[in-house]
From Swiss-Prot:
Organism name: Homo sapiens
C1q binding, as annotated region: 76-93
Region (Disordered): 138-164
Alphabetized InterPro entries for the sequence: MAM33 (IPR003428), MAM33_sf (IPR036561)
The protein, known as: Complement component 1 Q subcomponent-binding protein, mitochondrial
Amino acid sequence: MLPLLRCVPRVLGSSVAGLRAAAPASPFRQLLQPAPRLCTRPFGLLSVRAGSERRPGLLRPRGPCACGCGCGSLHTDGDKAFVDFLSDEIKEERKIQKHKTLPKMSGGWELELNGTEAKLVRKVAGEKITVTFNINNSIPPTFDGEEEPSQGQKVEEQEPELTSTPNFVVEVIKNDDGKKALVLDCHYPEDEVGQEDEAESDIFSIREVSFQSTGESEWKDTNYTLNTDSLDWALYDHLMDFLADRGVDNTFADELVELSTALEHQEYITFLEDLKSFVKSQ
């Protein structure tokens, strides 16, 4: 039952979303910030454990703990139940973890990690191509039109696996002009992800294009930014071909989803372990 908790929309998702770490500050901060997405991992069953009809211990007076250990810290029956739940959840998440190590990207990309932010770097023919993405808020909601199970109701059918589809930024720098970078802000349209029947279709899209100075820590809003919503399709196709010639194509986008999903799952398990240690600590 426990692995399925990751596949049902969370009843208490809004509170857990606040626990997720904010993306580290970087020149890509604004472009990498995705639109708010509804949380998809359910901790809603957390308070509905077998045999419990209320949350004990929360109103007990602060002082020497009720268990009689004499530590003087606040740890309740609810905390113990929480730790037990997290232990079971961590165990089950490790069972369904597909990648014990992060998958490799083909095409000679080198991976650099900084918390939840990842960079893929590739040098080819006098150019440096950098792809940056952040796994925070990268899992889209999975709504199938069916009602959520009520408390105590078991989920019988296997739910779809969670997939991380982060926004990503492609930065191209030419060696003969290292002061200027062509920046393309890309994303995965939700209606295109997982559509295998249309082999010709692009599974990612370019949203914005701009030139930015490589020496600036923050990109300037005063630099002209081209929005592709009103762009001529011929120019847009050339931009997509420009990326494909540098290794950013559908194959790359598929592998990035696999890498991001593995990284997100890895960070999720680490978060559960940290949460367990925090609740358990005295």
